[in-house]
């Protein structure tokens, strides 16, 4: 049975459309500061287009600096095509736990008024993946500058761009490939920018969500069923370095989910996974267990609870979202207890990332030295069912990128600790009192399962 599944997975991957790549066309960036430097450099050199898809673009010092760069280059070149796609709901609310004030969308309006470009174009667009943020957001990643794709799970704000002391660690790849860039831009224009549900954010007369609920539902359904990247000169899996862009939305017919599952079935020696939140969908849990049963090696690099962006230090006032890092840690503890023998033998390596009070946002999959998945997908039930996600699958049959891959992985491991035993992780009775109360309440009313599905 497993042989049949493995063969089918191999056929699925072989049938994906790929674009041939040269090794010199892809560059792995090593830090959030380098990512910011590249964004600014690529903006300044853009001649025909700048397309950005991100969860949010924050009103803060880094957000202002990058937006000033965009407006400056737009002033110099009015014909430059600039489009920024942000989650509709996220742009119009304040940060969790923050006092009510002007939103990011309000700031986009102010900036448009401040700069007053001659043709006064809309640049920011709100993409509603569902009628409520909790049931789905725009988690599609990738910045396009002319023929260059800068791919990362990062959004635009102070910590993602290491504006001050703190940073949020992600992965960053720069791929210079005209057809890949065209494919990503065409996907935005053909599928994401459906103006029956997608509205400009840099205007004051935005519709209220409840006024366009029907349009949003129809938009989500159409995007889930039809959204895909098209490649003009695609080839079936060639025996050369190549890349395939992927999209997925919803629990069924989700190409990105299917590819991730197929990758897990293609492991011959070793699987490496990065995720900030230890909360795998059941299907991936089963596949990891099967790999371990079959003697394959698995390495999981996950953020320590302190490196979670929801973490609240015990001395600060507690908010409900602050329980999430503890919930993820309790998941991890159970997992490590279950596979205690494999951890002791070194077959399963679990690494916890922590660097002071900086945060960890990495996600990705590496299969042997053949497949590299760049994605914003957190490999959790929410990504599997609710959010719009994308990814770039790189196939490297001749290990042309091996040196860059090993360098990236070693950088990721730099601030990690290998777990030797599950008891190194705290358990419920060691958590702060408010966290204990909330997690016990969740368990009592069976809300913990629901929380894991949507967060």
From Swiss-Prot:
GO terms for molecular function: CDP-diacylglycerol-glycerol-3-phosphate 3-phosphatidyltransferase activity; CDP-diacylglycerol-serine O-phosphatidyltransferase activity. One of its GO terms (biological process) is cardiolipin biosynthetic process. It is found in: Cytoplasm; Cell inner membrane. Gene3D superfamilies: Endonuclease Chain A. CDD domains: PLDc_PSS_G_neg_1, PLDc_PSS_G_neg_2. InterPro entries: PGS1, PLD-like_dom, PLipase_D/transphosphatidylase. PROSITE patterns: PLD (PS50035). It is a peripheral membrane protein. Keywords: Cell inner membrane, Cell membrane, Cytoplasm, Lipid biosynthesis, Lipid metabolism, Membrane, Phospholipid biosynthesis, Phospholipid metabolism, Repeat, Transferase. SMART domains: PLDc. It is an enzyme of class 2 (transferase). It catalyses: a CDP-1,2-diacyl-sn-glycerol + L-serine = a 1,2-diacyl-sn-glycero-3-phospho-L-serine + CMP + H(+). Belongs to the CDP-alcohol phosphatidyltransferase class-II family. This is CDP-diacylglycerol--serine O-phosphatidyltransferase.
């Amino acid at each position: 049975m497993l042989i049949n599944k493995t063969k089918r997975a191999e056929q699925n991957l072989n049938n994906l459309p790929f674009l041939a790549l040269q090794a010199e066309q892809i560059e792995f960036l090593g830090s959030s500061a380098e990512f910011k430097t590249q964004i600014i450099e690529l903006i300044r050199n853009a001649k025909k287009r700048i397309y950005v898809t991100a969860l949010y673009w924050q009103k803060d010092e880094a957000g202002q600096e990058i937006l000033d760069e965009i407006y400056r280059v737009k002033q110099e070149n009015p014909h430059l095509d600039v489009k920024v796609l942000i989650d509709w709901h996220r742009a119009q609310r304040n940060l969790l736990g923050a006092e009510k004030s002007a939103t990011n969308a309000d700031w986009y309006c102010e900036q448009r008024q401040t700069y007053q470009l001659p043709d006064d174009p809309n640049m920011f667009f709100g993409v509603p993946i569902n009628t409520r943020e909790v049931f789905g957001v725009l988690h599609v990643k990738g910045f396009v500058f002319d023929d260059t794709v800068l791919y990362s799970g990062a959004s635009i704000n102070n910590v993602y761009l290491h504006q001050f002391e703190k940073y949020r660690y992600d992965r960053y790849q720069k791929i210079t490939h005209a057809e890949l860039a065209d494919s990503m831009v065409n996907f935005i224009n053909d599928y994401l920018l459906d103006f029956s549900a997608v509205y400009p954010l840099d205007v004051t007369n935005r519709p209220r969500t409840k006024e366009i609920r029907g349009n949003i539902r129809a938009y989500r359904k159409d995007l889930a069923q039809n959204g895909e990247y098209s490649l003009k000169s695609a080839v079936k899996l060639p025996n050369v370095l190549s890349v395939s862009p992927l999209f997925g939305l919803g629990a069924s017919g989700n190409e990105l989910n299917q590819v991730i599952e197929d990758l897990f079935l293609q492991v011959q020696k070793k699987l490496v996974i990065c995720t900030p939140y230890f909360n795998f969908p059941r299907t991936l849990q089963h596949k990891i267990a099967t790999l371990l049963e079959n003697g394959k090696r698995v390495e999981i690099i996950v953020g320590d609870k302190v490196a979670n962006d929801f973490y609240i230090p015990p001395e600060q006032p507690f908010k409900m979202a602050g329980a999430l890092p503890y919930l993820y840690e309790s998941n991890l503890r159970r997992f490590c207890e279950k596979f205690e023998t494999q951890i002791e033998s070194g077959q399963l390596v679990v690494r916890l990332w922590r660097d002071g009070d900086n945060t960890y946002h990495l996600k990705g999959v590496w299969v042997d030295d053949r497949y590299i998945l760049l994605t914003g997908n957190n490999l959790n039930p929410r990504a599997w069912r609710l959010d719009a996600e994308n990814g770039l699958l790189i196939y490297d049959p001749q290990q042309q990128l091996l040196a860059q891959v090993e360098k990236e992985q070693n950088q990721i491991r730099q601030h990690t600790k290998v777990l030797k035993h599950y008891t190194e992780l705290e358990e419920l009775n060691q958590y702060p009192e408010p966290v204990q109360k909330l997690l016990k309440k969740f368990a009592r009313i069976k809300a913990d399962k629901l929380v894991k599905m949507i967060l």
